[in-house]
Amino acid sequence: FLSAITSILGKFF
């Protein structure tokens, strides 16, 4: 689950 969050954050940041 955390991997999905970091993936999305990486897309914005």
Curated annotation (Swiss-Prot):
**Residues with PTM Phenylalanine amide:** F13
Report the subcellular localization.
Secreted
Q: Which tissues does the record link to its expression?
A: Expressed by the skin glands.
Biological process (GO) annotations?
defense response to bacterium; defense response to fungus; killing of cells of another organism
The answer, when asked if Secreted is one of the entry's keywords, is yes
Q: Which keywords accompany this UniProt record? A: Amidation, Amphibian defense peptide, Antibiotic, Antimicrobial, Cytolysis, Fungicide, Hemolysis, Secreted
Q: Which GO terms describe its cellular component?
A: extracellular region
- Which family does this protein fall into? Belongs to the frog skin active peptide (FSAP) family. Temporin subfamily.
Function description: Antimicrobial peptide with activity against Gram-negative and Gram-positive bacteria and fungi. Also shows hemolytic activity.
Q: What is this protein called?
A: Temporin-1SPa
The upper taxonomy is: Eukaryota, Metazoa, Chordata, Craniata, Vertebrata
